Amino acid sequence: MIFIDACFKKPTPYTPIWMMRQAGRYLPEYMEVRKQAGDFLSLCKDYKKASEVSLQPIDILDVDAAIIFSDILVVPLEMGMNLRFEKGEGPVFDNPISTLEDLEKLDDQNAHKKLNYVYDALKLTREKLSQNKALIGFCGSPWTIATYMIEGSGSKNYAKCKKMLYQNPELLHKILNKLTQVLKLYLEEQIKAGANAIQIFDSWASALEYDKFFEFSFNYMLEISNFIKSKYPNIPVILFPKGISGYLDRIDGNFDVFGVDWSTPLDLARDKLSHKYTLQGNMEPCRLYDKNAIKEGVEKILKTMQNKAHIFNLGHGILPDIPVENAKYFIKLVQESSAK
């Protein structure tokens, strides 16, 4: 698998590519399946449909890896939190956590056993996927998941989380630790079900100041990665903490790929990290609106990463109104332009 080879810094015939949110709303085929499922959460829980949409970008765009269709918040859902998705508002928890009592009500022993719909989707997808295409399993970072559990929804300033961080850091650490233990088991089950690689999404890393990022987010991601790498050394682990270009000097640990978001200069990440890790990223997703912008972005990134281990990706998820033609052009251009 070219994607796995790149994760481990092995030579590849061209730069492998996939896109975050590649199974998504920009594809009419995805919208059709989502309509059949009824709503987003029902689609996540219907393993056959989740598998179908996971495979669509492979069939339509010929990306080098599929990522399983799911959501980072199915974990707190199966721990006992009441999750719903509101149109225009995103995910909402009706019972956010603010006390130790709230936390103790959550089931961390059985949550990973209730996520069979994710494992079934992985099994089915791996069966249908051609042998040269990788299948990526994933989870959110403990910090990013915790922000939703504490705020009750998405947030602009993370005031409830940060209030807890400064007033009651012990409680926040307990929440993060509980999540970390569940996520280890969850990812292990994903690997057993057929995931060839694991990505940990830390979407809200940039909400934390320098020292607090390492204490409350990065260290927990490393604990998960250490667990996976000690048991499954052949499974690459990708970390994607978004928006922390000023923190790169302290990034170190036992993982394989570092995801670079579009706001981080790729040459900066290359100079600081490419001796240790394969880099993944980092094209600005809005470049996909225009073919000239795509071409310019692809050329610049390939030049920056010349002779370095690299997986091409966007620097965040693909947007819902990107023309499919442009996405196809992007994938093909990367694969052809980078061919050795």
Curated annotation (Swiss-Prot):
Top-level lineage group: Bacteria
Catalyzed reaction equations: uroporphyrinogen III + 4 H(+) = coproporphyrinogen III + 4 CO2
CDD domains assigned to the protein according to its UniProt record, in alphabetical order: URO-D
Enzyme class: lyase
GO biological process, one term: protoporphyrinogen IX biosynthetic process from glutamate
EC number: 4.1.1.37
GO cellular component, one term: cytosol
Positions in coiled-coil regions: none
Keyword Lyase recorded: yes
Compartment(s): Cytoplasm
Residues that bind substrate: 21-25, 71, 148, 203, 316
Site (Transition state stabilizer) residue list: 71
GO molecular function: uroporphyrinogen decarboxylase activity
Keywords carried by this UniProt record: Cytoplasm, Decarboxylase, Lyase, Porphyrin biosynthesis
A Pfam family assignment: URO-D
The keyword Mitochondrion is assigned to this record: no
TM ranges: none
InterPro entries linked: UROD/MetE-like_sf, Uroporphyrinogen_deCO2ase_HemE, Uroporphyrinogen_deCOase
Role, per record: Catalyzes the decarboxylation of four acetate groups of uroporphyrinogen-III to yield coproporphyrinogen-III.
HAMAP family hit by this protein: URO_D
Family stated for the protein in its record: Belongs to the uroporphyrinogen decarboxylase family.
Complex formation: Homodimer.
Protein name as annotated: Uroporphyrinogen decarboxylase
Protein source organism: Campylobacter jejuni subsp. jejuni serotype O:6 (strain 81116 / NCTC 11828)
Source lineage: Bacteria, Pseudomonadati, Campylobacterota, Epsilonproteobacteria, Campylobacterales
Gene encoding the protein: hemE
